[in-house]
């Protein structure tokens, strides 16, 4: 098990069922050292108001030795790469994931999806692309992986894509992992937990990475320091409270 989980939802996204406190408790039980809360961006019908994201700055950095990253799973809105994370939200958060969600960006065609995803990657506002293997949003996987490597944006391998959501993602996720491997990019693993009990669950992700021989040194979740160094390399501020993670 890796000690870092980069994708999960709380009761602030009303189709999820756990609180921040629940995740902290599970992190302590499971040996998770750093996790990111990434509730849905405000353009989703059940998402929190943008004030929720701005006010995350009041959260403690560490609770019982567990580090908490203030994040969002923003929505890709259009082919210009716009996302629903702007203004004060950008400066209040530590980490921004973005991806396609049908209520905000209805599925179209492969070229449109690819254009939108690459524009989002190139925008400089996003650190990780969520569930790029979603079969409802086919993309040019090679082109996206090359753009992600060029702009130092990680592509996610999402454990829920193999278990609860986005059925039929397996082959695409394998292709994404192989393309990122060949392009020299990074992957981020996300449990995409909607309940704290699946925090840190990467079993299916690990199978895919093993199948394609993905290099361990390019998996962001291996240590907290690797993830934090990645964020700092993209211009995010150093977080002194995490010095000993």
From Swiss-Prot:
Binding positions (Zn(2+) 1): 7, 9, 73, 192
Binding positions for Zn(2+) 2 per the UniProt entry: 15, 40, 194
InterPro entries per UniProt: Phosphatase_YcdX_put (IPR023710), PHP_dom (IPR004013), PHP_phosphatase (IPR050243), Pol/His_phosphatase_N (IPR003141), Pol/histidinol_Pase-like (IPR016195)
Gene3D superfamilies: Metal-dependent hydrolases
Record GO terms (molecular function): phosphatase activity; zinc ion binding
Pfam annotation, one family: PHP
Positions that bind Zn(2+) 3: 73, 101, 131
Family: Belongs to the PHP family.
PANTHER family on file: PHOSPHATASE YCDX-RELATED (PTHR36928:SF1)
UniProt protein name: Probable phosphatase Ent638_1550
Organism: Enterobacter sp. (strain 638)
């Amino acid at each position: 098990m890796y000690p870092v989980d980069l994708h999960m939802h709380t009761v602030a996204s009303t189709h999820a069922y756990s609180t921040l406190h629940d995740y902290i408790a599970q992190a302590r039980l499971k040996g998770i050292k750093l996790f990111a809360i990434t509730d849905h961006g405000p353009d989703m019908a059940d998402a929190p108001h943008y004030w929720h994201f701005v006010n995350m700055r009041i959260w403690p950095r560490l609770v019982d030795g567990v580090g908490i990253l203030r994040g969002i799973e923003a929505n890709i809105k259009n082919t210009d790469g716009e996302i629903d994370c702007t203004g004060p939200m950008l400066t209040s958060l530590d980490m921004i994931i973005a991806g396609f969600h049908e209520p905000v960006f209805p599925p179209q065609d492969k070229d449109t999806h690819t254009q939108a995803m690459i524009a989002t990657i190139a925008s400089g506002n996003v650190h990780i692309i969520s569930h790029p293997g979603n079969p409802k949003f086919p993309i040019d996987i090679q082109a996206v992986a090359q753009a992600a490597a060029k702009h130092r944006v990680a592509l996610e391998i999402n454990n829920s894509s193999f278990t609860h959501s986005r059925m039929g993602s397996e082959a695409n996720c394998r292709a994404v992992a192989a393309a990122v491997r060949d392009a020299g990019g990074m992957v981020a693993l996300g449990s995409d937990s909607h309940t704290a009990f699946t925090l840190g669950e990467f079993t299916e992700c690990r199978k895919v990475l093993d199948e394609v021989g993905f290099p361990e040194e390019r998996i962001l979740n291996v240590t907290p320091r690797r993830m934090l160094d990645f964020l700092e390399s993209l211009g995010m501020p150093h977080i002194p409270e995490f010095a000993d993670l």
